[in-house]
């Protein structure tokens, strides 16, 4: 770990007939309370060093990217500093997306009592005035729902990524599943429904329900759709490969061909029409390799590549709840009724690459898989540690093996929007050849 260190500063100025002593520190200079954060990110004690300077106010200048649960932690760290210094803390955070990182804003003022007295907007530029003369009440401004913060952050990340890469329009494949449905919602909010196109690519194994659900979702969002059936293309590949394979492709080869046919169609349309192709895979799939190189992994941005499947279900359930109405309206989405839809949220996950296929045919149930993945990835625990605390040994070793063997796919994956403490991409460096 690289420890960055800045000397605490003090700025003195005249205002309102009195002399003010403003303490100044940078971002993780606040992160010195190991009992709050779990680790000490700074050498020394930048907050303690400011105590001798007796500031009237501490200004913390941050460029702190979003991670789930981090908003509450920032408040706790700022409140701890305010209590030690006996003065308010003004926490000022950057807002905007920069590649994988999304800076979610949410600047605030916490009084010496620990109460949050001013809260600026999330995932949007904001400017407000705080009157230091007001008596700091002990009541605090509550945080928004965690799903509200997550939704706004993903929308901001997608919008800024597209804008900074020179794209106004986006394309995605719409399958009738929950992952592509969530990406469609995010794209409509980030770019406007008129700038989003969804392509349906049904195969002989696609259910009528998946097609109907996709079209209904697109209608609710107001996004354009197109349909290109892939049965004839599948037959063409079967014929072309029949002689060299001594028979048509079968099993996993045939399934991957379907995904690659779809990926090629999407890339061709995006290329011809000048659109940003959005990959719709989730973190669970990327972790265990339940995805196809040059197929469903195609895209310029993996919008939900840092969301586990269970998190996708949870966020979609919140989006469809009355609690999301204000957030949806603020993002330019319809405020009433379901967006994702119960039919999509409640269907068993399936890639529909063979008859009656379910994700659970190849993987543990996501309720089992995702906590294990989080322990292995974010918490950096070993299978031995998990087994010692009661995890089934065969399951822990199987999931660890899947995680290691999928590294070659992740190395070629599209960049994603980081919303956890440890995401795949630039913050994840593992060897490909250590998968045995």
Residue ranges and their predicted role:
Residues 1-173, 189-190, 225:
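Enzyme catalytic cores with a strong preference for nitrogen-chemistry domains
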Residues 20, 86-87, 112, 138-175, ...:
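ATP/NTP-dependent adenylation/nucleotidyl-transfer catalytic domains that generate, transfer
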């Amino acid at each position: 770990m690289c420890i960055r260190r800045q000397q605490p500063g003090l700025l003195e100025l005249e205002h309102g007939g009195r002399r003010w002593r403003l303490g100044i520190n940078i971002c993780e200079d606040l992160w010195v309370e190991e009992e709050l954060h779990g680790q000490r990110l700074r050498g020394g004690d930048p907050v303690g060093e400011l105590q001798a300077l007796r500031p009237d106010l501490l200004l913390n200048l941050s460029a702190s990217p979003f991670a789930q649960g981090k908003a509450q932690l920032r408040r706790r760290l700022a409140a701890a500093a305010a209590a030690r210094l006996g003065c308010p803390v003004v926490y000022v955070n950057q807002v905007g997306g920069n590649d994988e990182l999304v800076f979610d804003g949410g600047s605030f003022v916490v009084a010496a009592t620990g109460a949050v007295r001013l809260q600026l907007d999330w995932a949007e530029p904001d400017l407000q005035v705080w009157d230091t003369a007001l008596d700091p009440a002990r009541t605090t401004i509550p945080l928004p729902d965690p799903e509200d913060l997550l939704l706004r952050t993903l929308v901001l990340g997608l919008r800024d990524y597209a804008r900074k890469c020179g794209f106004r329009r986006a394309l995605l494949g719409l399958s009738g599943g929950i992952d592509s449905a969530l990406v469609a919602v995010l794209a409509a909010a980030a770019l406007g429904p008129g700038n989003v196109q969804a392509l349906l690519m049904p195969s002989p194994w696609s259910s009528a329900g998946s097609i109907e659900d996709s079209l209904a979702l697109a209608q609710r969002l107001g996004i354009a759709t197109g349909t290109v059936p892939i049965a004839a293309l599948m037959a063409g590949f079967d014929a072309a490969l029949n002689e060299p394979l001594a028979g048509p492709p079968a099993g996993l080869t045939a399934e991957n061909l379907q995904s690659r046919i779809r990926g090629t169609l999407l890339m061709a349309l995006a290329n011809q029409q000048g659109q940003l192709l959005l990959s719709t895979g989730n973190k669970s799939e990327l972790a265990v390799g339940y995805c196809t190189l040059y197929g469903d992994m195609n895209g310029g941005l993996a919008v939900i590549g840092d969301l586990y499947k269970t998190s996708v279900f949870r966020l979609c359930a919140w989006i469809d709840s009355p609690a999301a109405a204000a957030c949806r309206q603020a993002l330019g989405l319809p405020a009433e009724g379901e967006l994702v839809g119960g039919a999509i949220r409640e269907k068993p996950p399936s890639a529909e690459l063979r008859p009656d296929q379910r994700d659970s045919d190849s993987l543990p149930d996501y309720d089992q898989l995702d906590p294990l993945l989080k322990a292995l990835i974010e918490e950096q625990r070993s299978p031995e540690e998990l087994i010692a605390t009661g995890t089934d040994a065969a399951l822990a070793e199987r999931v660890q093996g899947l995680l290691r063997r999928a590294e070659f796919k992740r190395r070629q994956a599209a960049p994603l929007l980081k919303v956890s403490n440890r995401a795949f991409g630039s913050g994840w460096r593992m060897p490909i050849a250590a998968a045995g």
